[in-house]
Amino acid sequence: MNGWANYETWNAALWIGNDEFLYNTAKACVTYREGLETPWDKFVRCMMEGEIGAFLGATGDGVRWDDPAIDADEMNEMLWDL
């Protein structure tokens, strides 16, 4: 799908690339990840836990950030390039 592994990966990348809050959060996840945590793991954790997770646990199209169909390697590559 448009060069991405599948719809879920494409959709997550699309939302991160086109929403200012998600974009800035993703950039922060690259900088502030902990230990061996990947940027994508940090982003998913930030988006799924606490108050944010209650409201932003999925893209605007309903794809959950922790959807196992999302290709983590592709998402990490995209996040490193932000």
What is each model feature region?
Residues 1-82:
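Acidic interaction surfaces
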